[in-house]
Amino acid sequence: GNEILIEISADILFDFDESTLKSSAFSSLRSAAKKIRDSARGDIRIEGHTDSKGSDSYNQTLSEARARSVRDWLVKNARLSDFTFIVSGRGETKPVQPNQTDQGEDNPAGRQRNHRVEIIIKTSE
């Protein structure tokens, strides 16, 4: 319970299929950095997530690369090098919305929610 979850849509952070941050990402990342500075007491987890399009291994690799990009930006641009970051990719394994409808149709709105990066800040040791 002693955590803050920041969820940032991959659409804000990255172009389709990319792990290089877009300039539209910076204000969200600056606000995340402020929360980290104000609240973090312990490790900060950064987890990349994808939707179910593409192969499992591709999505795993992409989600890891995206999480690393966020960590690297926070360390370099927000000067958070004193904090310990645990970076991981979850691929398509932890959707927050269904990737398909009950009828088996594609669910673009659900998939959009699923490709994201989560920053989990521990607020007590």
Label the model's feature ranges:
Residues 29, 46, 87:
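Conserved hydrophobic/aromatic pocket- or pore-lining residues that grip, position, or stack substrates
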Residues 7, 24, 45-48, 52, ...:
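A generic structural signal for ordered alpha-helices
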Residues 1-43, 123-125:
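Periplasmic peptidoglycan-binding/tethering modules of Gram-negative envelope proteins
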Residues 49-125:
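Periplasmic OmpA-like peptidoglycan-binding domain that tethers envelope proteins to the cell wall
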